[in-house]
Amino acid sequence: MSSAKLGSASEDVNRRDANYHPTVWGDFFLTHSSNFLENNDSILEKHEELKQEVRNLLVVETSDLPSKIQLTDEIIRLGVGYHFETEIKAQLEKLHDHQLHLNFDLLTTSVWFRLLRGHGFSISSDVFKRFKNTKGEFETEDARTLWCLYEATHLRVDGEDILEEAIQFSRKKLEALLPELSFPLNECVRDALHIPYHRNVQRLAARQYIPQYDAEPTKIESLSLFAKIDFNMLQALHQRELREASRWWKEFDFPSKLPYARDRIAEGYYWMMGAHFEPKFSLSRKFLNRIIGITSLIDDTYDVYGTLEEVTLFTEAVERWDIEAVKDIPKYMQVIYTGMLGIFEDFKDNLINARGKDYCIDYAIEVFKEIVRSYQREAEYFHTGYVPSYDEYMENSIISGGYKMFIILMLIGRGEFELKETLDWASTIPEMVEASSLIARYIDDLQTYKAEEERGETVSAVRCYMREFGVSEEQACKKMREMIEIEWKRLNKTTLEADEISSSVVIPSLNFTRVLEVMYDKGDGYSDSQGVTKDRIAALLRHAIEI
């Protein structure tokens, strides 16, 4: 790549190039918008009418508790639970009776268990003991029951042997039964075996489940139609937000000014929409989409293109946080720096306009500085040849992975609670933030370490673990996969122990972890977004659901 294209970048420096592919979307999201709501007041009226019908179904008193549990679960899985948060909480509190399960079959017990644990209610896994035979083994051949049991096992915490047995039992049975199943159950099972619901991006899970539920003979027509209309209405909002972000990206002309970096504004929006899709979080989504865009540019500059001297100058400029500092960094970096300052200034103005104050913008700036410092350390690893210990690498990578930053910035953008106390607590990297960050790092490194080594990088969780503990590459990768499961159990545990302050961090921690699970399930789906990532973005942001 010609250094001359990048302004004052030195032409005699041997620079690396990751050869990232261009955007797969071109200007599509700059011009594309849904016409679903155009001049169609009847759709809005129908949506409101159906919402009331579904609410009535949810709150009506009934002695048929299995049906009420199933309905509550379907509302959530169809992606419309955010309309009924108060009603769902009330229903779950009623269902949180430890004796109720004595009358449930295994299918209902599994759904009940997953629902309650998934919403922070403490339920013992002992509820599954009565479904084991005299030999201590589970007994069922029913595919739907096995599917529900398998989904429930992913809410397990450390030490729950019965759920470890249940996941092995149900997975083995489902894999054997899958070829014999018909639609829609076969797709439900296939999706769960690929990515269980608890670990899936909730918006993507809803997109998958809507046509599956629509094909069920026992479906509720009003609920099915409501889910379709609501999905399309939300999609129209998300398209408008992405169009605005694409316009900002285009105005700065990042792709042509920084051709070594990933051009991934749509993928970044998909990431942030996966973390919080609800309309009330529009401001947070817009801000975080720009943040992930600018952070990605900085990451690529430090990882791939910049010299150690150049990135050190940029780090110093970030510490100053002053437009005057732009004069002290290489010309090619200046567009990143001015873009960065502009994002935070715009966010501050929007917070003041929306809420009357800037809602702890200083926390946002500090956590951004922190991630740049972590990038600096990683650049020093590469340029000096320094190999950190495994613990030293992981301590820095918890920050460089970005999840602490994204969680704190999401909290500021959402602004739903006593923010300063929550931010003080979240800034200490509590257990749930640490678990989320570690899962992200293990997943990321497993999928990217070989590509990074082709660029000359030798520091990763895999390589540091191999070096320190004297194990093979295969053994190190196996250990990383085991650690992902351990940290998921720890993350699950923290959701059950959450107090008033930490409960506000539960959903961001879970959702960012879910996005990473999905984005990297078939490789680095952010850097290489030409395959399944493109398909998923199209499903969520391009193709409406047929009514």
Swiss-Prot record:
Motif (DDXXD motif): 299-303
Domain of life of the organism encoding this protein: Eukaryota
Catalytic activity, as annotated: (2E,6E)-farnesyl diphosphate = delta-guaiene + diphosphate; (2E,6E)-farnesyl diphosphate = alpha-guaiene + diphosphate
Listed GO biological process terms: diterpenoid biosynthetic process; farnesyl diphosphate metabolic process; response to jasmonic acid; sesquiterpene biosynthetic process
Binding site for Mg(2+) 2: 299, 303
Name of a matching Pfam family: Terpene_synth
Keywords: Lyase, Magnesium, Metal-binding
Co-factor binding details: Binds 3 Mg(2+) ions per subunit.
EC assignment: 4.2.3.87, 4.2.3.93
Amino acids binding Mg(2+) 3: 444
Family annotation (CDD domains): Terpene_cyclase_plant_C1
Pathway per the UniProt entry: Secondary metabolite biosynthesis; terpenoid biosynthesis
GO molecular-function terms, A-Z: magnesium ion binding; sesquiterpene synthase activity
Positions with a binding annotation for Mg(2+) 1: 299, 303
Top EC group: lyase
Induction: Up-regulated by methyl jasmonate.
Role of this protein: Sesquiterpene synthase involved in the biosynthesis of delta-guaiene (81.2%) and alpha-guaiene (18.1%), two structures composed of five- and seven-membered rings. Also produces 0.7% of alpha-humulene.
Annotated domain remarks: The Asp-Asp-Xaa-Xaa-Asp/Glu (DDXXD/E) motif is important for the catalytic activity, presumably through binding to Mg(2+).
Family in the record: Belongs to the terpene synthase family.
Protein name listed in UniProt: Delta-guaiene synthase 1
Native species: Aquilaria crassna
Gene: C2
